[in-house]
């Protein structure tokens, strides 16, 4: 017997935040930054429906918006991503990612942490986090689409790392492997 899970919502604001977060992802993936920004403002006005998980995802999407709009301050974004991770992980340990049970939002936050570390010149952290995420995703049960999307996002950051360390051949091979999965 196959059962499909459907979310339940305690209030209308809870539903509105959930739905708006999905819309923001759609707009960001379509590079429609103005409606994404407007929806993020709307979610903030709803006070994230008093839900720390919505707030954490909102912070992630806010960072994505800043990066895609070209307005990102990488030091600030790095700290914002660390803050977002601390909402559910009070003690962040990049060395122990493989031993954690992470949500897809937390995985994305770790990927963004690696990317921001790379932009700040911390190639060792970027390399380590990307490797941890890659092995983590290979060993966890996720839907094929979700795993492929997260692996592709991680591959983008790892490719940037490889380009930074001038390993062009590996960067080409990795980008070619994942170029159709985003």
Predicted features and spans:
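Tandem amphipathic alpha-helical repeat scaffolds
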Residues: 19-31, 59-72, 105-122, 150-166
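Basic, Lys/Arg-rich alpha-helical nucleic-acid-recognition elements, primarily the DNA-binding modules
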Residues: 1-14
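Short acidic alpha-helical/loop segments enriched in Asp/Glu that coordinate divalent cations
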Residues: 144-149, 169-173
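Helix-turn-helix repeat elements of alpha-solenoid scaffolds
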Residues: 27-43, 69-94, 120-139, 164-179
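Flexible helix-coil transition and linker loops at the boundaries of alpha-helical arrays
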Residues: 9-10, 45-55, 86-103, 136-148, ...
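Short intrinsically disordered, low-complexity segments
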Residues: 130, 143, 156, 180-181
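Internal amphipathic alpha-helical repeat/solenoid segments
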Residues: 2-5, 37-49
């Amino acid at each position: 017997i196959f059962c499909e899970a459907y979310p339940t919502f305690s209030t209308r604001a809870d539903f509105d935040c959930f739905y708006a977060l999905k819309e923001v992802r759609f707009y960001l993936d379509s590079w429609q930054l103005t409606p994404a920004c407007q929806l993020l403002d709307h979610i903030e006005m709803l006070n994230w429906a008093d839900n720390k998980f919505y707030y954490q995802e909102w912070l992630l999407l806010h960072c994505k918006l800043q990066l895609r709009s070209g307005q990102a301050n990488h030091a600030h974004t790095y700290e914002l991503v660390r803050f977002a991770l601390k909402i559910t992980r009070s003690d962040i340990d990049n060395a122990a990612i493989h031993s954690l049970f992470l949500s897809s939002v937390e995985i994305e936050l770790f990927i963004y942490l690696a990317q921001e570390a790379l932009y700040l010149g911390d190639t060792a952290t970027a390399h380590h986090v990307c490797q941890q995420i890659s092995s983590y995703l290979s060993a966890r049960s996720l839907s094929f689409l979700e795993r492929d999307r997260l692996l592709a996002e991680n591959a983008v950051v790892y490719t940037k790392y490889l380009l930074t360390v001038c390993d062009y051949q590996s960067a080409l091979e990795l980008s070619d492997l994942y170029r159709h999965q985003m």
